[in-house]
Amino acid sequence: MMRALATLLTAVAATLIASAPAEARKKKQPVAAPPAPQVALPASANGVNVRYYYERRQYPAIWFGAKGGDAAISQLLTILRRAPIDGMNNGPTVAASVEAAVQRARTSNDPMQVKAAELAMAAAWADYVQAIKRPSTNVIYGDPALAQTTPHPDRTLALAEAAPSLAQHLQSVASINPYYSAIRDVAIAEAAANGGRPSDKALLNLERARIIPGSGKYILVNSAEQRLHMIEGGQDVGSMKVVVGDPIELKLPTPIIASTMYYAIANPYWHVPTHLIKKFAPAIAKSPAAYLKSRNYEIISDFGKNPQILEPSSVDWKAVAAGTATTILRQRPGGQNSMGKMKFPFPNKEGIFLHDTPTRTHFAKENRNISNGCIRVEDYRRLANWLFGRDIAAVGTDPEQHIAMQRGVPVFVTYLTMVPSSTGMASFEDRYGWDRPGAMAGGMSAGSGAISVGGGASPK
């Protein structure tokens, strides 16, 4: 009975389906909405990141908005047109593309064209900032926090979007620092007079100037000028002569360094470098005790805080002279000490530091490329008082007194043969030969520098 009933129901269902209209039997498929048009990506490696930044924020009007406008767009185009000097070699081409995109947006009044122009300007700016903040070559970074790093477009655009005035923000970022801006103006003038190509000297000085901050408190040592500058709030508040490395006889030019100083040492020991110990060894071997006593030297067991003092006769000085043995030699604090009364160390792999000196006659010389690489300062007390904000002369006579700073002070040792002065640009002899491309180990990396002249004045 149940089987018969099931058969009957199946037959009825089949009849009903067969009698239904064909269109009713077809299940209607939902009609897909046409895809929303996407804004074209700018021709930039940062194009995808830039578009994603805008999409996440529902396309903010960074460039066409109230904080941007004509002044910011004009500033951007000026920056891009001379960007090869800054290391962005396709800057003029990008400027032409951006200018065309802006023109299309203004004439068409098409929202998609406006968005495309926003992306084009944002990508161009992100590319430029990455170019000027590219990692520097031939710099010893004693403090990794000071190293140039390539910024992500998100950060670049967030700073631009947050700026009260976009035009002023662009000008500030592109300025980099007063040294860089002044040298760049020279490079632009050279390009205008030389078929679009500035001198190698200007381009290499620009590359070396890039590591210098635009603000803050820091020490700047310019080995080409043979002077130390005390910079505070972006202003040069004092300077003094220095003695720097000898590139000719000793072949020890002072390298380019970016580091941070955290303390000074009053009444320092001088630990004699190994190569000098080897050099002195033949003379010491003739009369070890008398030689060391006359120069206030002593031999120590190790570099620990409380090393054992060794007898001069315990060292095989002939073996030291031959290079088959070594020893640790240091000079006690006092009038003969090569470090003078104060030493200003900062981390770096070459062991370079600032220090006082008992040899004052060197500061009267025009050429002060005399040292083994370290930097002898003309007035240690003035430098110390500026660093610490107080007079630290009365520190006593105890040896090796470490005086900590409340806050570390960056130290930038560079080599600029051209710098701004009160009367224009001062130029210095290229004693190290680093104004020739590839003269430094590994070569300094700079832009092509070729620009289309007549593209506008350089923003400072």
Regions found by a protein language model. Name each.
Residues 11-20:
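Hydrophobic h-region of N-terminal signal peptides that target proteins for export
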Residues 25-146:
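Cationic-aromatic interfacial patches
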